[in-house]
Amino acid sequence: MVMMLKKTVKKGLIGGMSFAKDAGKINWFPGHMAAATRAIRNRLKLSDLVIEVRDARIPLSSANEDLQSQMSAKRRIIALNKKDLANPNVLNKWTRHFESSKQDCIAINAHSRSSVMKLLDLVELKLKEVIAREPTLLVMVVGVPNVGKSALINSIHQIAAARFPVQERLKRATVGPLPGVTQDIAGFKIAHRPSIYVLDSPGVLVPSIPDIETGLKLALSGSVKDSVVGEERIAQYFLAILNIRGTPLHWKYLVEGINEGPHADCIDKPSYNLKDLRHQRTKQPDSSALHYVGDMISEVQRSLYITLSEFDGDTEDENDLECLIEQQFEVLQKALKIPHKASEARLMVSKKFLTLFRTGRLGPFILDDVPETETDHPNSKRVVVL
């Protein structure tokens, strides 16, 4: 399955993506990131501990490889954020994988106070040996764009505010749905005796992403702006993943009318209307909106199940897979209630479909496979990114 997907991506079959030399180079690396990377490197030299925030759905792909050598020389905790959107069984395998490599790792939800408190307890434990001899300690939070650094900083800030109600504190970090919101390095105190400061940093990518699939995973999870790759391409890539993995076949219960299944909670109890799914944790919609979105999500999953179950081709055949994806775009347009003759209908389908994935409405996913072979082991050349 993995080799098939890599082959499909490399040949440019996902959304007609052409990465040939004459096709033009995708610019993953906005200009401000170069200066930000230099600033981060300078702060890392002074930091006593690094919290590297990664997206739990892409534990390996969301690592900034350019900073790994510098971070590996520091006390470091890998925080796999957005655990509520990740498959819990696979996530447990990932945390065990990192721990087996003697790398501290914890899965968190940056919006959960109890989850962040567990992370801070681990930070305190890691700093225990230097707390007695250092009057001031620096903890730096780093990560690629849109992995939830600012949300984590805000939660830490709230905890610090409760500890020190009269201290002078910086404003909370800005949280937005687009990558690259935080563009400056700022910090605030979270403890006395010794003084412990937490430094936030802007999200930065590597200047060049040589692995196309890694780039697509970053785009799918929202770490690369949709406009860089194109929503249609990203949606087609996600459909390829679903089909090759056979995920829609697990949604059979929707066709049979059974109110049970691996993602039943995600379908029967949606929390937001589709328009507001990009802005989670907003006010609750009324019951009619809940039913509308619930029906729409069910119809999306039901449609994908039917198209894949009735598909008589081979998902490992590039042409067959491409035909299946085209068919699924047609049924998704109907399921998402997009007018048949609407201009830019495919773009509208792509945007709504991606929103459902990114907000967990289609169920929990992890896109990266846990390394199993010796060549994928963290001590090998590849795992410089741990």
Curated annotation (Swiss-Prot):
UniProt short sequence motif DARXP motif, positions renumbered to this chain: 55-59
Pfam family, one: MMR_HSR1
Superkingdom assignment: Eukaryota
Summary of the knockout phenotype: No visible phenotype when heterozygous, but completely female sterile when homozygous.
Ribosomal protein keyword on record: no
Residue segments, region G1: 143-150
Subcellular location: Mitochondrion
Region (G2): 180-184
Region G5: start-end pairs: 109-111
Amino-acid positions noted as binding GTP in the UniProt annotation, renumbered to this chain: 81-84, 109-110, 146-151, 203
Cysteine pairs bridged by disulfides in the record: none
Residue numbers spanned by region G4: 81-84
CP-type G domain ranges (all copies): 37-207
Similarity comment text for this entry: Belongs to the TRAFAC class YlqF/YawG GTPase family. MTG1 subfamily.
Xref: PANTHER family: MITOCHONDRIAL RIBOSOME-ASSOCIATED GTPASE 1
Protein name per the record: Short integuments 2, mitochondrial
